Amino acid sequence: MSATTVTYSPKVFIPLTMLCRDRCGYCTFAQSPARVSAPYLTPEEILVIATAGSRAGCHEALFTLGEFPEERYPVAGEWLREHGYQTTVEYLVAMCQLVLDETGLLPHANAGALGHEDLAKLRRVSPSQGMMIESLRPDLVAHRGAPDKTPERRLATLHAAGELAIPFTTGILIGIGEDRSDRIEALEAIAAAHERFGHVQEVIVQNFVPKADTLMRNHPACSIDDLVDAIRLARSILPPEVHVQAPPNLVDDPGILLDAGIDDFGGISPVTADHVNPERPWPHLDTLRAVAESRGRNLAPRLTVYPEFATNPRRWLDDNVRFAVLDRSDAESMGRDDPGATFPERYEAAANVGSGAEVVQIGRRSTAWYSGADRLPPLLVPAEPRATGAVAEALEGVRQGQEPGEAEIVTLFSARGTEVAAVAALADELRFAANGETVTFVRNRNINYTNVCTFKCTFCGFSKGPLSLNLRGKPYLLSNEEIADRVREADALGATEVCLQGGIHPDFDGDYYLEVCRTVKAAVPEMHVHGFTALEVTEGARRLGEPLPSYLARMRDAGLKSLPGTAAEILDDSIREVLCPDKITTNEWLDCHEMAHEAGLRSNVTIMFGSIEHPKHWARHMVRTRELQKRTLGFTEFIPLPFVHMASPIYLKRRARRGPTWRETVLMHAVGRIAYRGWIDNVQASWVKLGVVGAQQLLQAGVNDLGGTLMDENISRAAGAAHGQGITPDDFRAVVEPIGRTLRQRTTLYEPVQPLATKEAAR
């Protein structure tokens, strides 16, 4: 996450119960039984609130409640027993699980001073928890009627949360009768707890605002000077990794809070009020965004659990909530920022698989964009470009002719808000310098010759067979004559390339791939054979016991011209161990492509992004392939392939994100253009996974190529993509002409294709 980022949590506020055994002098949240319609919200009422929040794009369900109301009010205990619960915390645990299951919102339990046992129960259903320290001064009049507000109880809860490794939110309430030394004491106690346990993710500095109908209604409000001073104290006393938050609805100018040192605005709800401060409505996100941008910052959504904790789930998250956090995370473990709903996805086996996915989604549908979905992405480019801080420095370095290294590439991937447009704008400048206003495409046909595979790639929804992870669907293996027929059909439709890919069939040896090449060339001698990944040729050579350079030379002589870069996935072995544990390693992929280039073959660089990896892995992938290109000049293009999650086994096993966000997709193409400048001049958008409307945005972010017309593309469709199965040049033309570009057909190796009329005249 960039240092220029200001975060907030899009949330709904769920007041589970407004009954409380404490009577604080400043509180309007707590009510008596006579003033509430029921002691607790019902499950149905809770789901109405949570569902509305999920539809509005929220990630958090903030459960706020009075402390131990059953200890004070018999009606509370009676209600709980009638509904099958013994305590408020027991009911809270059940409702957190309900919201998690039905809406996917991440519960944040703000249940007050709890003991070890109750905190542990909530840890299973709530990725983060919170409790305000408020103040450690024991003689505050404001806390005279509040047995749960003693310093001992608050500190005991803070420490118990640390012992249980709970990502924890706490804070101080200023202006309730304490003085500056009291604030310092509380902040130092919080800092000491964090130094011991490492669990404090954020500290709220909340200013007291007097409210009518409270004992402190005539008490003066906390001054802005005191608030600013307290924020500065927090920033100086707390360890730097602890985030500092202040509620923006309790001040007239939220910019003051940023100037004082906060980096988080806290929870902001588009659908519910601030039930603790109902007289102070949430500021609109556009207002907060403008405030942040006026100070060179960008506003970004986060989850209830901060990235520092979400990226180490084994320590900080219970197994029960890990996937729920992952499912709403982007690659930096921030909140996914595409507008729309993100509901939990449920699947059942498809009745008729064909060439599509083996599972179908049932139940409530998400409306946010994701790779392969039949919906429009948000408009990120073109937009007004503006960057500050590290992103601006990295962009300026590129403009000065510097080659971005791994650190600079990671920085560019951290761009948010107007920084995304700035990265895209530079990428588009470099695109124009390399390619002008021409957008290219190739007429081709995919021939997926078998879907039987002995390898166990955890992301693959395409392969079928006894050793694959997906056992439904009909395995097939095309005959040579079927392959030849498809090549001739492709030629009749104007294709210049066939793209050959398939599973690693247990009956194949290396001669099979040679035979396929000869079959294609016999059917249509001038057809370009683009086929066989590094995995296929490496495995073919291994099964023959032949050195790979020798085998590649024989493949070349049989008609192979270029290799697809697929099988690269992410060129980092820590990621490959999860995605493709029995596949070739990073070095084996790189070595294979280097040998292919030395044999006179060409290939491309692909990257499958958006599953389990992070920006540092993207950067390593780019640097490693760039270094190879410097030695061989054999790569023709860079093709980002967004992970399509819907029918992917690793997603169905709840171990992957739901693909990249649109921001990440734009950046992958733009940063790729920047990182490969001068070495790989062509950047392609995969319309199969992005749709043609998405591809149009990317043409303004560094992309110059739309790939192939792809008759018979069924690998992406097997993973659940809605796109695929062919597109026409007229479809491409409708994408490029509205943005002032010219469409041109190319060969696989980016040579111009002679127009059909000219070829016929030449005959």
Feature locations, PLM:
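Conserved Radical SAM active-site core
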Residues: P33-E195, R386, K464-E627
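An N-cap/entry alpha-helix motif that binds or orients negatively charged groups
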Residues: M1-S9, E403-T440
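Glycine-rich, proline-tolerant flexible connector loops at the mouths of alpha/beta enzymes
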Residues: Y8-I14, A34, T64-G84, N207-H219, ...
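Canonical Radical SAM [4Fe-4S] cluster-binding loop centered on the CxxxCxxC motif
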Residues: V6-T7, K11-E45, F68-P69, V439-E482, ...
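Auxiliary Fe-S-binding modules of radical SAM enzymes
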Residues: L47, S54, T103, I184-T418, ...
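Hydrophobic faces of well-ordered beta-strands that scaffold small-molecule active sites
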Residues: V6-I14, A61-F63, P107-A109, Q129-M131, ...
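Active-site beta-loop-alpha junctions enriched in small/polar residues
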Residues: F13-P15, G66-F68, N110-L114, E134-L136, ...
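Conserved, mostly hydrophobic/aromatic
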Residues: C24, F63, M131, A161, ...
